Structures are given as C-alpha cells and as structure tokens.
C-alpha cells in the first residue's frame, strides 16, 4: 500500500509498524517496546498502563520472559479485564482480542463460535492463550515482535473480508475502543452472521457521528466521490502445481469499485502491490 493511500485512510502510522526487541538492545529500544505493547494491547488506555506493570517490565528487561510472554501478561491482567472484558459483550471482547493480539479482525462465524465455546469450556486464560500461542501468532510475530495491525495489507491466509472488517474495529489512532459509536455491542456480528463484507466508513464518535464531511478515500460513495485509482497487482496461480512466471497487472479503478477489486484480486490468488491515485 502506497504512503499516499495510507494517509488518506488515516493508517500511515500503523502500516508496517513492526517493533522488535533485538539482541543487545538498548534501554531506549526497550522503552519503545514497552510503549508500543501498551498501545497495541490497551489502546488509549495504554497511557495509564505502564506503572501497573513494573514487575512484568523487570522480567522482560532481565531476560526472564520474551515479548510474547510480556504480551500474555498484559492480556491476562486485571487491567485488561477492566478495560475490555467486564464491560463488553462476549463477542465484542473476542473482536477486541483479535484486534489487539493478532492485529486483524475475525473473518467469519466459525472463528467467533470457536472462542465462545473455548471460553465456556476452559475459561479466560485459555481464551487469551489461544491467540498468543497460535501458529498464526508465531508466524506473524514470533517471540520478540510486538503485535501490530496486519489486516490493512495482504497477509498469508487472509480472507478478503478481513480488509473491510479491520476498518470496523480500528477507528483511528486517537480513538478509544471503549468510546466508539456502538458502545459495548459487537461491531461485526450482523455482517459475520450473514457472511457479508463490512462497508468502510469514516471514523465516528457517539458525540459527533456526522460532523465530518471531508472527502477522503474512506468517504461514502453516496457523497459523489469520482476519483480514480491505479491498482497494481501480481497475478495469482490458483489450482496449479506448475511453476509459472507471475505477471504484474495494472487496473484503473473508480473509488466505489476499490473494495470489490481488492476482493476479486485476492479471490484469484493475486497480491496487491500498490494503490495510487490516478493523476
């Protein structure tokens, strides 16, 4: 995804935001890991988190735990429960766990049902561990990368609805998960239950749900957005075991077809390389 498109989507600071605790780290680098972890796991509430986790910070600083285990301690903490568990519906809590711990939105009803059943059978800690000790987490973050929002770009195993769904959960860096329009209710329940993609809409708040009229890439098509975009993609090679050269394809797409084109390319096994405004 190009920088200009990421700016229009208000996600420039989140795309490719990979913070890793490397060997021979400095104290400044460790502090960046702490700050990023608090922001990812707690969102806006992360501003108040650091003094609550002095013991966990000491364990990571002294090499007793990995970044993955540090994230686990945060997500199993009473503070995380106070922020997201006690005051939200169960499905909303699952949505937020996907967002905070795997950096994406849940794709379909089977993922929601799995976690509902897991919590009922094994409890809170097992629910948190199911994300952090999953093959997906290991492949994406390993032991020393802080989770980040991956759903804005093509990722292995991603379903096409994931791109739209993450925008329903991520409403801007300054937005709080607990102060969004929709309150404690699940954001994805209706679309997931109907197996439909979510519509990408501008960020809103309970106070100012309709105050913004700025025309951006996420402006609703009904506002008459007539811009065109150039989508560059690498062709897919579905249903074949033969090694072939994958060609680069270029599409000129109107705004209101952008999401559909994204989905069509991924259904054919392709990968989007760049999206730029047409001059």
Swiss-Prot record:
GO terms for biological process: photosynthesis. Residues 2-178 form the PBS-linker domain. It is found in: Cellular thylakoid membrane. The keyword Thylakoid applies. It is a peripheral membrane protein. Residues 226-278 form the CpcD-like domain. It comes from the Bacteria. SMART domains: CpcD. Its main location: membrane. Keywords: Antenna complex, Membrane, Photosynthesis, Phycobilisome, Thylakoid. Coiled coil: none annotated. One of its GO terms (cellular component) is phycobilisome. Belongs to the phycobilisome linker protein family. Rod linker protein, associated with phycoerythrocyanin. Linker polypeptides determine the state of aggregation and the location of the disk-shaped phycobiliprotein units within the phycobilisome and modulate their spectroscopic properties in order to mediate a directed and optimal energy transfer. This is Phycobilisome 34.5 kDa linker polypeptide, phycoerythrocyanin-associated, rod. The gene is pecC.
């Amino acid at each position: 995804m190009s920088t200009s498109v990421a700016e229009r989507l208000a996600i420039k600071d989140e795309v490719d935001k990979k913070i890793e605790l490397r060997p021979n780290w400095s104290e400044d680098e460790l502090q960046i890991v702490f700050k990023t972890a608090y922001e990812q796991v707690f969102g806006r509430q992360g501003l108040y988190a650091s003094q609550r986790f002095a013991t966990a910070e000491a364990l990571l600083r002294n090499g007793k735990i990995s970044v993955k285990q540090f994230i686990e301690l945060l997500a199993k903490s009473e503070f995380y429960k106070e922020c997201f568990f006690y005051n939200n519906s169960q499905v909303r809590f699952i949505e937020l766990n996907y967002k905070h711990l795997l950096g994406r939105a849940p794709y379909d009803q089977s993922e929601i049902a799995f976690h509902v059943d897991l919590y009922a059978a094994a409890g809170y800690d097992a629910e948190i561990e199911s994300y952090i000790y999953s093959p997906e987490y290991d492949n994406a973050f390993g032991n020393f990368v802080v989770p980040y929002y991956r759903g804005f770009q093509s990722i292995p195993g991603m379903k096409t609805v994931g791109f739209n769904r993450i925008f329903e959960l991520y409403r801007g860096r300054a937005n709080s998960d607990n102060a969004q329009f929709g309150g404690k209710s699940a954001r994805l329940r209706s679309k997931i239950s109907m197996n439909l993609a979510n519509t990408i809409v501008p960020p809103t708040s309970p106070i100012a749900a309709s105050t913004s009229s700025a025309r951006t890439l996420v402006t609703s098509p009904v506002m008459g957005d007539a811009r065109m975009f150039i989508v560059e993609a690498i062709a897919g090679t579905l249903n074949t075991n033969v090694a072939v050269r994958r060609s680069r394809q270029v599409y000129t797409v109107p705004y209101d077809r952008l999401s559909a084109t994204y989905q069509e390319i991924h259904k054919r096994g392709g990968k989007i390389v760049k999206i730029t405004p047409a001059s």
